[in-house]
Amino acid sequence: MTAELREAMALAPWGPVKVKKEEEEEENFPGQASSQQVHSENIKVWAPVQGLQTGLDGSEEEEKGQNISWDMAVVLKATQEAPAASTLGSYSLPGTLAKSEILETHGTMNFLGAETKNLQLLVPKTEICEEAEKPLIISERIQKADPQGPELGEACEKGNMLKRQRIKREKKDFRQVIVNDCHLPESFKEEENQKCKKSGGKYSLNSGAVKNPKTQLGQKPFTCSVCGKGFSQSANLVVHQRIHTGEKPFECHECGKAFIQSANLVVHQRIHTGQKPYVCSKCGKAFTQSSNLTVHQKIHSLEKTFKCNECEKAFSYSSQLARHQKVHITEKCYECNECGKTFTRSSNLIVHQRIHTGEKPFACNDCGKAFTQSANLIVHQRSHTGEKPYECKECGKAFSCFSHLIVHQRIHTAEKPYDCSECGKAFSQLSCLIVHQRIHSGDLPYVCNECGKAFTCSSYLLIHQRIHNGEKPYTCNECGKAFRQRSSLTVHQRTHTGEKPYECEKCGAAFISNSHLMRHHRTHLVE
């Protein structure tokens, strides 16, 4: 090796290298049991490791019998005979990638004698003068030896200095190996798989990113210590545990409301921004969530996905199916002695009989109000505590009862699952349908004791009775005027705000109430 070559190798910048190799005859080395063809293509070298021993198969160094130790590596591209499944020890086969501690340490292929394609070995690299055309190898042994001779020592010291500067600048460890399209014997694969299991998934023969074998099998290795629920990813477990700890790290800057997940915050912020990215292609109605759009689109498609198992009748909504299935429940062995109404469960009969007896065993400690069921008491107590655990994701409105939330959400989805069999009019609540059907039947069960006027709904009777008793519970904060109905107060407040939501389509005149708009329409009819 000439002094110019040594200096070029020592001062060479770090970068990918290609070393040309001439065709050579097969050679035998001590410790070689057998040989087979090794096909290695596109071997790339990229990351820092310590003290790789390499050798030059040149005549000058071969005569001296020297082994040169460098903290560098090369790119090999060779096709030749190599020992099969045998350790080379300290011997070096020119042009062949031998088993090394680099491969062993980083969990990649260290088996010789296999046909390998696209092997990317990420170790440090330097440039070699291609004029020499001398094949370099990575030896089995990784050693640090004092360089022999002053010239070689100076060259190695410069190479080490460049390497240390590179490591300090990058501050990264790129030691990883990717093996693609690797054809290995089954015995070797089994050995490597055992290593993978022992390492807990950190060691993997697979190409690309490291994968945990437990998650590949559909298992859920991350378990909540509170409730025992399992997750396939640790990140999902962290989010889940916030349910138990009450942690809500994602806070809205507009209103201060906090959420467990960032996705919930994004949906919530659309209330303030007014953004509705999910638009119905049929009618143009927009929604803040894709789930609400899906429910809405059933109105247009009339898709009936909920089928009855008894008669195969299909419905668009689960609530419609649940109501229909009551038709098939014929066995009602628990009958009320007072009114003859039957029930499928004795507990339902006991609760029903309290209507006749007037028994209300569940009383509120704050106000003394009593209820026939404990569930009703729990909901009532929230009126004292102010607790509203059920929140609408669309607009953020909260409710003390889950059933109230379900009814409210139909405002956003436009769902009206209760249809009148007489006229086909649909309603979002069953109670509204029952009241409506009394128009057809003429049933007016709620009668005023003062004047004898009857009504289809108890709330209508309550409002009417305020005429007799003079009660006006709804007061305007601006002027102090009081009203018998909340709707009357809402209309009145528009006189202060100037809001006029009802607009005439013909002339553009706007009004504070629908009744005023209807009165205005009559002027156009006269014309």
UniProtKB/Swiss-Prot annotation:
GO molecular function: DNA binding; DNA-binding transcription factor activity; DNA-binding transcription factor activity, RNA polymerase II-specific; RNA polymerase II transcription regulatory region sequence-specific DNA binding; sequence-specific DNA binding; zinc ion binding
GO CC terms, sorted: nucleus; perinuclear region of cytoplasm
Crosslink feature (Glycyl lysine isopeptide (Lys-Gly) (interchain with G-Cter in SUMO2)) location: K20, K21, K99, K117, K125, K144, K158, K189, K214, K276
Region of interest called Disordered, as start-end residue ranges on this chain: 16-38
Primary localisation category: nucleus
Region (Globular domain): 9-221
UniProt keyword Ubl conjugation present: yes
Gene3D superfamilies: Classic Zinc Finger
Coiled-coil regions listed in the entry: none
InterPro entries hit by this protein: Znf_C2H2-type (IPR050758), Znf_C2H2_sf (IPR036236), Znf_C2H2_type (IPR013087)
GO biological process, one term: regulation of DNA-templated transcription
Zinc finger feature spans (C2H2-type): 222-244, 250-272, 278-300, 306-328, 334-356, 362-384, 390-412, 418-440, 446-468, 474-496, 502-524
The entry's keywords: DNA-binding, Isopeptide bond, Metal-binding, Nucleus, Repeat, Transcription, Transcription regulation, Ubl conjugation, Zinc, Zinc-finger
Location relative to the cell: Nucleus
Function of the molecule: May be involved in transcriptional regulation. Involved in cell differentiation and/or proliferation.
Family: Belongs to the krueppel C2H2-type zinc-finger protein family.
Name the UniProt record assigns to this protein: Zinc finger protein 35
Native organism: Homo sapiens
